[in-house]
UniProtKB/Swiss-Prot annotation:
It catalyses: tRNA(Thr) + L-threonine + ATP = L-threonyl-tRNA(Thr) + AMP + diphosphate + H(+). Keywords: Aminoacyl-tRNA synthetase, ATP-binding, Cytoplasm, Ligase, Metal-binding, Nucleotide-binding, Protein biosynthesis, RNA-binding, tRNA-binding, Zinc. It is found in: Cytoplasm. It comes from the Archaea. Zn(2+) binds at residues 298, 350, 474. Its cofactor is Zn(2+). The keyword Protein transport does not apply. The N-terminal domain (about residues 1-143) is an archaea-specific tRNA-editing domain. Catalysis of tRNA editing is performed by the charged tRNA itself. This is Threonine--tRNA ligase. Residues 1-147 are annotated as: Editing domain. The lineage of its organism: Archaea, Methanobacteriati, Methanobacteriota, Thermococci, Thermococcales.
Length: 625
């Protein structure tokens, strides 16, 4: 349920027409209404509320009364308002929930009015404008069914005691509340976010508007929340990122595999691992057997490793899969655009190491690999904050190693230390992006796992022919691909707030060059130019719309096109092109071959995919609005 609470001088409404087939029956008197000195509750009842309407009604009544007490309102008004959500409950459910809220407020002794359900209504409202006059609330019911919650998650949510510090590149370990965050504002935000451990998304982050405006990604009302649809431009960006990260990991030395997306709850090793991994699962029934959808590639890669014959000469042994998809049944209130999903694409590498020294060596290399991967998508260490998590014993034994990592990143990092080991790992780092709402999301991460080799029966033969259990490193050098897209868009949103021009990295731009003829007369030359550019494996399109040149240029600017090429009589006669480069705003005249050379130099070493849409703008559908 979504509520907008407005403390008002008055609210008045007038019914105009039916909005649904079977609206609430009303009398002539109820077609108009007014209430003065009133707290108005605009309410959208959502589909998720159908799971537990009793709880939603009770929570809504309590929220409204709490605000009424704060603003000293005795008059309350319940206004059905479908426009606060895109995932509405059935009209029959919504009407009943609203009726019960209305009756419940009356029973608590308030003077309560309401607008009828299921009609188009005109309304006027006069907001009082004080600090508490406009408030929003989101109510999420507990699951009606008992959900599978692993023991590790229960411990994380109830028992885990963390000790927080800041570690500097000079090796100084400072309690977080004693650290001077001057010059490290983002680190302060990240530390506050981590220590609070609140993941609820109470506002829409800026990247959501951008992903919709650019027709990249959208919500899918026909699926479970947290499962998204990708339009052609968004699919191109996601596909290029998938290819880029996979190539980097394979180049690093990993062997690519493919494994199932669902696993048996009753498999002894898997059952134990589930209770050591802090994540909620999707449950799938096949006949009378219960399966869970994977939340990482661990299971499949561990099962392969268990069945393999491995020598010490094979170590470190690296195995990789890009999971499309992994699934985590995140709480509804925590879902947020591309930042936190229930279905996501995870590059997942596991490395078997013979001992702690080899594991540390791999950990450091994968730390560097992660920095390199994020650098390729336009994220520098200035764009993310580092968290390193370990037990007190590990710190005491390997302090110098941890400080080496901090020196690599070149700035202070957040430390989470535990007196005892709660999870299967003894050391973990993440690179975390802090967005425009001061929420953080983990991107790259590596862990050293000391439990699962024995749990799954993964062994190698040492120099003496004896079977030993390896250590296992879990590594995602980028984090979920969707989160990389989120970080890129949030970074551009921040640049826009600073008055700077946003743009995708050139190799990721869905259209890298747009050719604009000054008039229809020069369309043939524009197509010739586009053909030459496309032949060099550069994504190019042509704006053939019959509109003013200035409007075409504005459209290209709005789409963040890196290179705008304008052609007219002069360019046609001289065989040249006039280029407007978004990166620095420079406008210059050049030859087609020179532009091709410039773009190829800037995109060297990155993957390429063809243009995702028709060449001519006039031939393209609109996917939104």
């Amino acid at each position: 349920m979504r509520m907008l609470l407005i403390h008002s001088d008055y609210i008045e409404y007038e019914v105009k027409d039916k909005a649904i087939k079977n609206p609430e029956p009303i009398s002539e008197e109820e077609k108009k209404g007014r209430m003065d000195e009133v707290l108005v509750a605009f309410i959208s009842v959502e589909k998720v509320d159908e799971k537990n309407p009793d709880e939603v009604v009770e929570k809504a009544i309590n929220e409204i009364i709490e605000v009424a007490k704060q603003v000293k309102a005795e008059n309350l008004f319940v206004y059905p308002f479908a426009h606060l959500s895109s995932e509405l409950a059935k009209p029959s459910v919504a009407q009943e929930v609203l009726r019960r809220i209305y009756e419940g407020l009356k029973e608590r002794g308030y003077n309560v009015g309401k607008a009828p359900f299921g009609y188009y209504k005109a309304f006027r409202i006069s907001c009082k404008g004080h600090p508490l006059a406009e408030l929003s609330r989101t109510i999420v019911p507990e699951e009606a069914k008992v959900e599978e919650v692993p023991e590790a998650l229960k411990k994380e949510e109830t028992e885990l005691v963390s000790y927080w510090y800041i570690l500097t590149p000079e090796g100084e370990l400072v309690e977080v509340d004693k650290f001077d965050f001057t010059g490290h504002e983002n680190l302060r935000k990240f530390a506050n976010y981590e220590i609070a451990k609140s993941r609820i998304a109470d506002k829409e982050p800026p990247h959501v508007r951008l992903m919709l405006e650019h027709e990249l990604v959208d919500y899918e009302p026909g699926s479970d929340p947290g499962n998204l649809r990708y339009y052609p431009k968004g699919r191109l960006i996601k596909s290029l990122l998938e290819q880029y990260v996979s190539e980097k990991v394979i180049e690093y030395g990993a062997m690519e595999v493919e494994t199932p997306i669902m696993y048996d709850f009753e498999h002894p090793a898997l059952e134990k691992y589930l209770n050591r991994f802090p994540a909620r699962q999707y449950i799938v029934l096949s006949g009378d057997k219960r399966y869970f959808l994977r939340f990482a590639a661990c299971f499949g890669q561990f099962m392969i490793s268990k069945d393999a014959t491995i020598s010490y000469r094979n170590l470190p042994l690296r195995m990789y899969e890009l999971t499309r998809y992994s699934f985590r049944r995140e709480k509804r209130g925590e879902l947020s655009g591309l930042r936190r999903l229930r279905a996501f694409t995870m590059p997942d590498m596991h490395t078997l190491a013979k001992d702690i020294e080899q594991a540390k060596d791999e950990f450091k290399k994968q730390f560097k690999l992660s920095m390199e991967v994020l650098g390729g998508v336009g994220l520098t260490p200035d764009d993310y904050e580092v968290a390193i998590r370990f037990t007190e014993d590990f710190w005491n034994e390997h302090k110098d190693f941890i400080i080496e990592l901090v020196k690599l990143i070149g700035k202070p990092v957040l430390i989470e230390m535990w007196k005892q080991r709660f999870f299967y790992f003894i050391l973990k780092f993440e690179f975390n992006f802090v967005d425009n709402l001061d929420k953080a999301a983990a991107l790259s991460t590596v862990q050293i796992d000391v439990e699962n080799a024995e749990r799954f029966g993964i062994t190698y033969y040492d120099e003496n022919g004896e079977e030993k259990y390896p250590l296992i490193l879990h590594c995602s050098p980028s984090g979920a691909i969707e989160r990389v897209m989120y970080a890129i868009l949030e970074k551009q949103a921040k640049l826009m707030q600073e008055g700077k021009k946003p743009m995708f990295p050139l190799w990721l731009s869905p259209i890298q060059v747009r050719v604009i003829p000054v008039s229809k007369e020069y369309l043939d030359y524009a197509l010739y130019v586009a053909g030459k550019i496309e032949g060099a494996r550069i994504r190019v399109d042509v704006d053939d719309e019959d509109e003013r040149l200035s409007k075409k240029i504005r459209r290209a600017e709005k789409e963040w096109i890196p290179y705008i090429v304008v052609v007219g009589e002069k360019e046609k006669e001289t065989g040249t092109i006039t280029v407007r480069r978004r990166e620095d705003g420079k406008q210059y005249e050049t030859r087609i071959e020179e532009l091709i050379k410039e773009i190829k130099q800037k995109t060297e070493g990155f993957p390429y995919k063809p243009r995702p849409l028709p060449l001519l703008l006039s031939q393209r559908p609109k996917f939104r609005g």
